[in-house]
A protein has these predicted regions:
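Intrinsically disordered, low-complexity regulatory regions
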Residues: 1-93
């Protein structure tokens, strides 16, 4: 795979994450930002850690019922939480 294909694939995945964020933001509003303002970085660490633990469970337990959440879904959620955390750090310090 050449560099442009990798960059194009990265851009597509980033757009998928943005689309997912937009849908969830309509459902949840700014609950992440509000919690971050109250509790700080630990609130973000907790959510990212939950997703990491979910990823580990999905990756190591083939018999687990994933309830419709695939490894890819979990990674997208984790990436979104990381980006949202960067946004909060830039906004709130």
């Amino acid at each position: 795979m050449n560099t442009m294909n990798r960059v194009e694939q990265f851009r597509k995945i980033a757009q998928d994450i943005t689309d997912l964020y937009e849908i969830k933001d309509r459902c949840y509003g700014n609950s992440f930002g509000q919690t971050y303002e109250k509790l700080g970085i630990i609130s973000a660490v907790t959510r990212i850690s939950d997703k990491y633990n979910r990823l580990c469970n999905l990756a190591t337990n083939k018999d687990i019922d994933n309830l419709g959440e695939s490894i890819e879904d979990t990674l997208k959620d984790m990436a979104a939480y990381c980006i949202m955390t960067i946004r909060e750090i830039r906004h709130n310090g």
